[in-house]
From Swiss-Prot:
Biological process, per Gene Ontology: bacterial-type flagellum organization; positive regulation of DNA-templated transcription; regulation of bacterial-type flagellum assembly
Species, as recorded: Paraburkholderia atlantica
Keywords from the named record: Activator, Bacterial flagellum biogenesis, Cytoplasm, DNA-binding, Metal-binding, Transcription, Transcription regulation, Zinc
Gene (UniProt): flhC
Protein name: Flagellar transcriptional regulator FlhC
Binding locations of Zn(2+): 137, 140, 157, 160
Length: 216
């Protein structure tokens, strides 16, 4: 009986730890690592202090079509396409790196992430199975997540044509005055400096706008 490589097992544990820290569900861990369910549960409890949540994973593509989730998902998937095409790593590693960049961009915009790691992983699986496609907005030229086989010639994204109540949530109403007062006191050159530093930290990674419109 061949003995299992200690190095490979260590890599699997490292990957599982990274996924758990990013909020992965147990089903994702089972699908992407070779560790047993019992070991994954123990690892999850050790890292999070609680048992992994139960229940089924998201299985509908409709969530990705709603207004805010759609452009967050579109941002992530365009990052993922770049990473998958140029990163030279496994699919799950591309997902992790892309998700970290997605979180970074959201933080730069002083926003909160809408897309969880499990949703991002599910999104990639939906694309791989042919259930979703990227459609090009005829106004801004950005590429956005859409149902497979939807007509593309007249597609307009939710940013160019937002629904009537887009962004009008209770939380947005509570935080808007704070954001407005904060923005009023920031010198005009600060956003450019912050973006330049973020770009330098990412080395050759594209900017936010590049991810949305990049052709791979």
């Amino acid at each position: 009986m061949a003995s299992k490589s200690v190095v490979l097992e260590a890599r699997e544990i490292t990957l599982a730890i990274e996924l758990i820290e990013l909020g992965a569900r147990l089903q994702l861990l089972e699908a992407e690592t070779s560790l047993s369910r019992d070991r994954l549960v123990k690892l999850y409890k050790e890292l999070k202090g609680v048992s992994p949540p139960k229940g089924m994973l998201p299985f509908s593509t409709d969530w990705f079509m709603t207004w805010q989730p759609n452009f967050h998902s579109s941002l992530f998937y365009n990052i993922y396409r770049f990473m998958a095409g140029h990163g030279g790593c496994r699919a799950i590693e591309s997902i992790v790196k892309s998700y970290r960049l997605y979180l970074e961009h959201v933080q730069l915009q002083d926003d909160e992430p809408v897309l969880s790691l499990t949703r991002a992983w599910t999104l990639v699986r939906f694309f791989d199975s042919g259930m979703l496609q990227l459609s090009v907005c005829r106004r801004c030229g950005g590429q956005f997540v859409a149902h497979a086989h939807d007509p593309q010639h007249a597609f307009v994204c939710g940013l160019c044509q937002p629904p009537s109540r887009a962004g009008k949530t209770k939380k947005a109403a509570q935080t808007r005055p704070e954001r407005q007062s904060a923005v009023a006191g920031i010198p005009a050159e600060v956003p450019q400096v912050a973006e330049a530093r973020a770009h330098e930290a990412r080395c050759t990674a594209p900017t936010l706008d590049t991810f949305v419109t990049a052709e791979v």
